[in-house]
Swiss-Prot record:
Belongs to the RecA family. RadA subfamily. A motif (RadA KNRFG motif) lies at residues 218-222. Gene3D superfamilies: 3.30.230.10, P-loop containing nucleotide triphosphate hydrolases (3.40.50.300). Disruption phenotype: Natural transformation efficiency with chromosomal DNA decreases to 10%; uptake of replicating plasmid DNA is unaffected. Increased sensitivity to methyl methanesulfonate but not UV light. Signal peptide: none annotated. This is DNA repair protein RadA. Keywords: ATP-binding, DNA damage, DNA repair, DNA-binding, Hydrolase, Metal-binding, Nucleotide-binding, Stress response.
Amino acid sequence: MEEVEVAEVKNARVSLTGEKTKPMKLAEVTSINVNRTKTEMEEFNRVLGGGVVPGSLVLIGGDPGIGKSTLLLQVSTQLSQVGTVLYVSGEESAQQIKLRAERLGDIDSEFYLYAETNMQSVRAEVERIQPDFLIIDSIQTIMSPEISGVQGSVSQVREVTAELMQLAKTNNIAIFIVGHVTKEGTLAGPRMLEHMVDTVLYFEGERHHTFRILRAVKNRFGSTNEIGIFEMQSGGLVEVLNPSQVFLEERLDGATGSSIVVTMEGTRPILAEVQALVTPTMFGNAKRTTTGLDFNRASLIMAVLEKRAGLLLQNQDAYLKSAGGVKLDEPAIDLAVAVAIASSYKDKPTNPQECFVGELGLTGEIRRVNRIEQRINEAAKLGFTKIYVPKNSLTGITLPKEIQVIGVTTIQEVLKKVFA
């Protein structure tokens, strides 16, 4: 019999904090008040739930060139005024980052740049500098020499993220990591990456529009589906504090195929324009195209309009879009989409001072939606004089005097009142 010495496993972790723990009663756990660090960008603070939480691990994903590095560089310059920032880049040199940082704003003395891809070296510098905030750009470029596999591989991304999580919890450092996305729009790397971090943010936008949307899809320290809206300018990202006004400012009065919806993004009401163009089909089957709207939802709405409202759409091409590049995907947009389609089909414009909220059922009924009071108040604040909402949603709410609220039950009733 031969005795064999077993090598110690280097990657074994005791806990998130690196210390041995034992089970505790929930009542015995000490509560703490988390002091969030606010940036100068209120839109960014809102998406995070009120500011940056110490010891949190935040993942930001988005298409290449959409502005992820610009956003984090801008946030870093602001955070360096209240704490020490270490910006680790595996994609650009320190000189390249300096050029961009000078364009974005003042650079504080507590802003450290580090062009490195070795996780051991990054950990060593974190222990030496002891920053309050750490930015990793990007997670796919950082590798640990203790793990087999090339940069960006599943094993490397998983282990480096786990090490960063332990680093954040042990040293109470807020860490932001940039993640690439695939052509399908999901984060590249293992799916468990999103489960490991505290917060997942997506930075979205159309290449041909200057507006960018920062969306929270997971947040352990705040509500999900919150959004922040920015505009990309020569000096960096600028907050859009009144997005409804921006999305509606180019709307033409008297144009057919247009309607306004009050949609909710997280806890925030936003008014957006839905446009429809319905034209006779020239060849074979009717064509359906959507931009910023769900294709299946649009097809369902057109089927309901044909069956319940008597619109002959089977031989009509339909082109639908949300103006301004914003994506609308909640059920409450159904009524506005239906009205826009009917407006184009009938070639009759809607009243520019009217807006619409409601989910459309297959039998033609208008179903209740959430946060109806917030939606009505937002429409009134922006000067709209009339809003169509589900009648069942009006129970127990206080209606503002500045706007006429019309409760409706069916799509036939809505079209009769709008196009009378």
